[in-house]
Amino acid sequence: SRGLGDVYKRQGMKYYGRLSVIALLAIAPLYGFAQEKVVPIKYGDMDQWIIRKVHESGVIGGNTKLLYEIGPTKEIDGNKPYKNMGGSPWGTSNVMAKVVGIVKTNNSVYRDKRDNGYCARLETHIESVKVLGMVNITVLAAGSIYLGDMLEPITGTKNAEKNMNWGVPFTQRPKAVRYDYKVKMSGEKDRIRLTGFSKKGQVAGQDCAITVFFLQKRMEDAEGNITAKRVGTMVVKYDKDSDGWVNGATYEVLYGDITKHPSYNHETMGLRERDYTRNSKGESVLIKETGWAEVNENPTHMIPVSYTHLTL
């Protein structure tokens, strides 16, 4: 098992993180006794990677950039929109964009060595593209991995999150999420806001890495709108340095209405209405969480996400 985030800051505004093996922990009866059962997520050991060679437009330098995707070992050369390969359920914040004819990339998740294999290094950095009279954007890009996929290329500067398809079908009820992680914080007491559409600002409060795991019971109406009840919730924030790698960290999944639970935090664990998925018609629609499921309900989808930057 390998693990989640090594997050620190350098060169003004950069954060880094590492992540690898993620598994779900279930309790299965065995000869009348409860027995732990660890169920790995496909490619969740982070030992296999697809490396994409994307050639950016000459007007912004014409550089060849490497984009890393979690999936079967493979190299892809050319500006080809990426679709998940080999049955990989993993999406990343690495994307190819083509805005007003200009090809630009963002890579904030990297393949990184750990022991005899690999892990994922998640980085938050400032990404900028400027072409006189055409485009002028500077934005803080967080490193993230999630279960789902991204529709490429990104073609506009607004509502890019609609290209993301959050979550994958899942009907089990895991007891916990387990992985290894390593954390080193920036030490800065405040965050920055840099959206690409306004001046650089400051946000009170320390930055942190965060992992969320949501189980949802989704429903689609005749018009293709999707609502969901929250079945299970697990959220953990990392705001302190770890003492090297922490192996086998295990976090309990809470079921049903957790608003009275001592660990409940509305900002990070509350019902959401900002994630997108594709409906049965192939349209990108907002997932509207309308309430908490009963404590014994089964989900239809799961959404694990890890970020190197707190985005609420």
Feature map (PLM): residue ranges:
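Conserved small/polar residues in nucleotide/adenosyl-binding loops
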Residues: 2-11, 308-312
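Bacterial Sec-dependent N-terminal signal peptides
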Residues: 9-40
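Intrinsically disordered, low-complexity repeat segments enriched in small/polar residues
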Residues: 17, 21, 25, 299-307, ...
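Aromatic (Trp/Tyr/Phe) and Gly/Pro-enriched flexible surface segments
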Residues: 35-174, 178, 204-303, 310
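Solvent-exposed strand-to-loop "edge" motifs in beta-rich extracellular domains
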Residues: 180-186
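Beta-strand acidic-aromatic groove motif in beta-rich domains, primarily in extracellular
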Residues: 188-196, 206-213
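Extended catalytic cores and adjacent scaffolds of nucleotide/polyanion-binding enzymes
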Residues: 199-201
